Regions:
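C-terminal interaction-tip segments
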Residues: 1-16, 51, 120-145
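Short beta-strands within extracellular/lumenal beta-sheet-rich domains
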Residues: 19-31, 99-102
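Contiguous beta-strand segments within globular domains
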Residues: 26-44
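Noncatalytic modules at the cell exterior or secretory-pathway interfaces
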Residues: 35-41, 107-125
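Predominantly extracellular/luminal cell-surface or secreted proteins
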Residues: 42, 59-66, 119
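Short coil-to-beta strand junction motifs in C2/discoidin
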Residues: 51-58
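Beta-propeller fold detector
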Residues: 71-80
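Extended, solvent-exposed segments with strong compositional bias
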Residues: 79-106
């Protein structure tokens, strides 16, 4: 038997779907009282050939306040990535990216608000399609102290 899970989570954008060629202005995402959050980072075929100079770094930050106090996440705050770079880098595009991809990043930190910056470096003459959707789950549970 299959079960419907659509009522067990809610979703919102950390990075609205668009073709980007420069940094986005991150909006605060309210994780509310959810006890789980998974970020689906979607990147289309690269508009350019990425390199160590012409790159995009996705930086995840979190805070207890909606508009201030944002700090970079660390490896202790996320699952699904091998490492977290300086400034909260959870994914970096530094080589050719010809095939669209989805990277799932589990947030297990204890902060209420999240922001995701697509930090562009170098020259990006052609935009790259991308988006990041946050899925809030375990809405009916209370976190342990």
């Amino acid at each position: 038997m299959r079960f419907d899970q659509s009522e067990t989570f809610t979703a919102g954008y950390l990075l609205p779907p668009a073709a980007y060629d420069a940094d986005n202005t991150p909006a605060s995402f309210d994780n509310g009282t959810a006890q789980a959050c998974t970020i689906a980072l979607q990147v289309g075929a690269g508009g350019i050939t990425f390199s160590g100079t012409n790159k995009v770094e996705f930086k995840l930050t979190h805070s207890d306040a909606e508009s201030s106090g944002f700090e970079a996440v660390t490896i202790d705050d996320v699952v699904g990535v091998e490492s977290v770079g300086a400034g909260g880098i959870v994914r970096a595009l530094t080589a050719a990216h010809a095939t669209p991809s989805v990277t799932l990043i589990g947030y297990k930190g204890r902060k209420r608000y999240l922001r995701l910056l697509a930090d562009f470096a170098g020259t990006h003459g052609t935009a790259t399609p991308m988006a990041a959707t946050a899925l809030r789950g375990k809405l009916d549970r209370i976190a342990p102290a």
